[in-house]
Regions:
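Glycine-rich, hydrophobic membrane-spanning regions of integral membrane proteins that mediate transport
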Residues: 1-431
Length: 431
């Protein structure tokens, strides 16, 4: 993997890679160090307790948060496959059938009819998958809602409710061992774990009875892994506040977790847009495309030789006609690389996948805009290289700014908040 590939991955705010870099490599170590520093202002013992709790909390939570949802979804997909359904069938295709005229370019019935004409085995298998879902829509929707519930509820319960209880129990045990010289009549609060039976009953009941309306099921099916992580982060906030050892710790957890959600899922998107807009204005270039595209020699050569083929317009029909009829065009290849469209091994578009027309239209606009800007420059190759370097710098700057806010500003602000509400620098739960 090249440096450009790595930068491209961490610059994709729709994926988990930016979260992985910020959370594990920068945010967690910084939070641990700040927690130790602030608690040491009160005592070394509290600093040790805070450090241990923070190490367990940060890294175990990161492992569950970043790995839990993808892992559960993978298991759920295997389960759905064993039941005879292909989890690649996007439920949004049912909603597309309601469109009329030139706006109707995809859908369950539409795709079955359109792609049945192909004799390729992978296409016929895909059509068979569509027919199976069409004939058993209610059953398939239940599988999708169960998948969503499992992928969000299970990690959230573990991170938000189980882990804090275990962490607090460990701290109490350490304190008991530390204070063995105290009189025997000094009582310590016992740890009450979550009721396993109750959790099991809850999970079975939810997976048996949970039913969402078609529209909501379609919305759920459209959620990316990073969207589900944001939802689980909201549940994590509720869990951390509700399991707090006292109200002061609850206030601090609410302050910390809400700030973290904003800085993880909202701020980076606006920082990226702002940096790209600033770069376009300052350097008179176009940095809206991904670095992988800007670094592609075939793409640059095609611009120089005026061999780039594009859809006639941004209309749904023109876009879909183009990607279906010209799968080997640079536009279609990059659309697939950027996950705007998916092709089967035979080169035919996968009829089970939903194509976000608005997203594809925006991509076409950015693609065309860069080509026009490059042609207007005196040196296309130099223009593209400059755009790539600036885009990479923007991505790294975004990671740096976001990480500074998450790993430096937020923890410092949290301890200022704790000092303001408690009069002490130590974590409220360690009182």
């Amino acid at each position: 993997m090249t440096i450009t590939n790595i930068i491209s991955a961490i610059g994709n705010n729709s994926s988990i890679y930016p979260l992985l870099v910020r959370d594990c490599c920068i945010e967690a170590p910084s939070k641990i160090l700040i927690a130790r520093r602030e608690n040491s202002k009160e005592s070394q013992i509290k600093a040790n307790d805070a450090t241990r709790e923070k190490i367990i909390d940060e890294y175990v939570t990161s492992a569950i948060w970043l790995g839990g949802i993808p892992a559960v979804e993978k298991l759920a997909d295997k389960y759905i496959s064993k039941k005879g359904y292909n989890p690649n069938v996007n439920i949004n295709l049912f909603g597309e059938e309601k469109k009329e005229g030139s706006s109707l370019v995809q859908g369950i019935e539409y795709n079955i009819k359109k792609f049945s004409q192909y004799s390729n085995k992978d296409v016929q298998d895909a059509v068979a998958d569509l027919i199976k879902v069409r004939d058993n829509k209610a059953v398939y929707e239940k599988f999708l809602t169960k998948k969503f519930a499992a992928a969000t509820i299970i990690p959230t319960l573990i991170m938000g409710f189980v882990l804090p209880k275990l962490n607090f129990a460990l701290t109490r045990k350490v304190k008991e061992n530390r204070n063995t010289q105290l009189p025997l009549n000094v009582s310590t609060k016992s740890f009450t774990s979550l009721n396993r039976t109750r959790f099991s009953d809850f999970y079975e009941k939810q997976n048996k009875d949970i039913v969402f309306t078609g529209g909501l099921t379609s919305t759920i099916a459209s959620l990316r892994t990073v969207d589900k992580m944001a939802i689980s982060d909201g549940g994590l906030t509720v869990g951390r506040v509700s399991t707090s050892r006292n109200k002061e710790e609850g206030y601090a957890n609410a302050f910390r977790m809400i700030g973290s959600m904003i800085l993880n899922f909202v701020t980076p998107v606006y920082i990226a847009k702002g940096l790209d807009k600033l770069a376009n204005k300052l350097f008179k270039i176009n940095v809206n495309l991904d670095p992988l595209i800007l670094d592609n020699e075939e793409f640059i050569s095609a611009i120089k030789e005026n061999k780039i083929e594009l859809p006639k317009s941004n209309s749904p029909k023109d876009l879909m006609d183009f990607i279906d009829s010209k799968p080997n065009s640079l536009f279609s290849k990059f659309a697939q690389k950027m996950k705007k469209v998916s092709y089967l091994k035979s080169g035919i578009r996968d009829p089970r996948k939903f194509v976000d027309i608005n997203d594809l239209s925006d991509f076409k606009t950015e693609f065309e805009s860069f080509i026009d800007s490059a042609r207007a420059s005196k040196n296309i190759e130099k223009f593209a290289k400059k755009a790539k370097y600036v885009k990479c710098a923007n991505i790294l700057a975004n990671v740096g700014i976001s990480s500074f806010l998450l790993a430096g500003v937020l923890p410092a602000a949290t301890y200022k908040f704790i000092k303001l509400t408690t009069g002490s620098y130590s974590d409220p739960g360690l009182k």
